[in-house]
Amino acid sequence: MNFNINILGTGGTRPLHNRYLTSVLIEYHGESFLFDCGEATQMSLRKQKISWQKIKMICITHLHADHITGLLGIVMLMAQSGNTRKEPLTIIGPIGIKKYLETNIELLRVHKNYDIIYKEIIINKTESILYEDKKKRIEYIKLKHSIDCVGYLFIEKNKPGKFDTQKAESLNIPKGPIRKKLQEGHEVILNEKKILPSDILGEPQKGLKFAYITDTAYSEELSTHIKNFNLVIIESTFKNELKEEAKKKLHLTAKLAAKITKKAKVHQTGLIHFSERYTLNKDLFELLDEAKQEYPNGEIFLTKDGMRLKANKDKFIIK
């Protein structure tokens, strides 16, 4: 299965020597999708030997510096790397993302040899589905922060079940294009008889569901958007002792993050976007402990810069 999630950075506010700013990249069947792009994101791509030329889309949650200041560098990098990019780059984000980037491109006289397609989100007006093809779709959800902010859902569509050769032979379905069409989910007419994919395919395989959520205050409604998701990467900026500060700044504690995923019955929860004050491992493990106490039956882990998660059946395995 070619579905990987790469953790490029896990910090908030400013980059540290061992913790870059929060950014996540999905590799899916030869295409890449980047979520947030703070300062030094391109350094993470280089360290993890990830091709920036394969990035099809960049999705920005909100226009705060720690989530967008690496964007111009990525745009420049794509233009300077051997002039090989042919496909346009799609950039998605709240209103203002186009003005931010185009102003910088103009002021710095950045030369780019490819097109940029902008899709600006007008919260509560823009249709929730931002992108869709035969295998997947990307949606946004409204978050509660000090400025317009969205979370992103990456939803893999259900895949056809296993092909039953014996059933195909019993129905006299010849090998070749007809079988392939049925495997792709299309009905066919054979000898004046309609044959459905369900006639020769097993139960459909459920697609995986992934969510990226940062920065936001606690909201009961948030859980409704991520019900039974396989993996949710969610901000855990503060320890519970700073819950009032989290509330004031419209952020989450690790405990509140776990409360959200517990209510949604999320299978795996990855904590991310740690406050710069937490520089010691013991601080991060305290965040993890607080989350596990809230959701003891959930699979919860700390994300780390350089971590790679690989899809394996109905879950993601840390590599």
From Swiss-Prot:
CDD domains: RNaseZ_ZiPD-like_MBL-fold. Keywords: Endonuclease, Hydrolase, Metal-binding, Nuclease, tRNA processing, Zinc. Disulfide bonds: none annotated. Zn(2+) 1 binds at residues 62, 64, 145, 215. Binds 2 Zn(2+) ions. InterPro entries: Metallo-B-lactamas, RibonucZ/Hydroxyglut_hydro, RNase_Z/BN. Its EC number is 3.1.26.11. It catalyses: Endonucleolytic cleavage of RNA, removing extra 3' nucleotides from tRNA precursor, generating 3' termini of tRNAs. A 3'-hydroxy group is left at the tRNA terminus and a 5'-phosphoryl group is left at the trailer molecule. It comes from the Bacteria. The active site is at 66 (proton acceptor). The keyword Cytoplasm does not apply. One of its GO terms (molecular function) is zinc ion binding. Its cofactor is Zn(2+). Belongs to the RNase Z family. Homodimer. Zinc phosphodiesterase, which displays some tRNA 3'-processing endonuclease activity. Probably involved in tRNA maturation, by removing a 3'-trailer from precursor tRNA. This is Ribonuclease Z.
